[in-house]
C-alpha cells in the first residue's frame, strides 16, 4: 500500500542526495519515477535536481499554480509510475500537499517529499506544516552545527555575513547566504549579530 513520506531537515543534510539515491534504487529495478522540484529554486539550473556531491537528475517543475494530482494522473495513464519524488517540498501549498496525498490514496503511488522544516525565522514553511500533519511517515535527516550538536535551525546571513531574522521568507541562496546551526547558536548569533565571533570562540575552547 502506497504511503506519503516527508524527509525533512535543516540545510546541507543531504536531502537532494537522498532523493536521487531513492530514485536510482527504483530505476535500477526497472521501475519508473517522476521527480519534481520547485520552479523558484534555480540555483543549479531549471528543471534539475542537483546534490552538493555532484549527482543530478532531470525534474519537472512545480509552482503554486501546478495541479500535481492532475499532472501525475495524466502521466500515469500514459505510462506506469512507480514512485513520485518531490524536492524542495517546503514550497508546496496546502492544496498541493493534499493533492499528493490523493496521489497516494487514489492512484496508489508512493510519494517521497524532501524539504526544509523551518525557515530562517524558525517558523514552519506552509508545505512543511501540512506534510508534517498529513504524511504517513516522517523521517528527519540530520546534519550538525559547527559545535557538533544536531543542527535544527537555519541562519540567514546578509551580504556582510551578519545574521538576521527579518524580511521575506523566501530568498534563494546556498552556503553563502544560509548556515545550519543548533538552536543555542542560532539564538546566540542573532543576539550578538555575528556568527563568526561565536565560531572563533568555539575553536579556542
Swiss-Prot record:
Its main location: cytoplasm. InterPro entries: P-loop_NTPase, Thymidine_kinase, Thymidine_kinase_CS. ATP binds at residues 9-16, 87-90. The keyword Transmembrane does not apply. GO terms for molecular function: ATP binding; thymidine kinase activity; zinc ion binding. Its EC number is 2.7.1.21. GO terms for biological process: DNA biosynthetic process; thymidine metabolic process. GO terms for cellular component: cytosol. It is an enzyme of class 2 (transferase). Zn(2+) binds at residues 145, 147, 182, 185. Keywords: ATP-binding, Cytoplasm, DNA synthesis, Kinase, Metal-binding, Nucleotide-binding, Transferase, Zinc. The keyword Signal does not apply. It is found in: Cytoplasm. Belongs to the thymidine kinase family. Homotetramer. This is Thymidine kinase. It comes from Salmonella choleraesuis (strain SC-B67). The gene is tdk.
Amino acid at each position: 500500500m502506497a504511503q506519503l513520506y516527508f524527509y525533512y531537515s535543516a540545510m546541507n543534510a543531504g536531502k537532494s542526495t537522498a532523493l536521487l539515491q531513492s530514485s536510482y534504487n527504483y530505476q535500477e529495478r526497472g521501475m519508473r519515477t517522476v521527480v519534481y522540484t520547485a520552479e523558484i529554486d534555480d540555483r543549479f539550473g531549471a528543471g534539475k535536481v542537483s546534490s552538493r556531491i555532484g549527482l543530478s537528475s532531470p525534474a519537472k517543475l512545480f509552482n503554486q499554480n501546478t495541479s500535481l494530482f492532475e499532472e501525475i494522473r495524466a502521466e500515469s495513464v500514459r505510462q506506469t509510475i512507480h514512485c513520485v519524488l518531490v524536492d524542495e517540498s517546503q514550497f508546496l501549498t496546502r492544496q498541493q500537499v493534499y493533492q499528493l496525498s490523493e496521489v497516494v490514496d487514489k492512484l496508489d503511488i508512493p510519494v517521497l517529499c524532501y524539504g526544509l522544516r523551518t525557515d530562517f525565522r524558525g517558523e514552519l514553511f506552509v508545505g512543511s506544516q501540512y506534510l508534517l500533519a498529513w504524511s504517513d511517515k516522517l523521517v528527519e535527516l540530520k546534519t550538525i552545527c559547527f559545535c557538533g550538536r544536531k543542527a535544527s535551525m537555519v541562519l540567514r546571513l546578509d551580504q556582510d555575513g551578519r545574521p538576521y531574522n527579518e524580511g521575506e521568507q523566501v530568498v534563494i541562496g546556498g552556503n553563502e547566504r544560509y548556515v545550519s546551526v543548533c538552536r543555542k547558536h542560532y539564538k546566540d548569533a542573532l543576539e550578538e549579530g555575528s556568527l563568526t565571533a561565536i565560531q572563533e570562540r568555539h575553536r579556542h575552547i
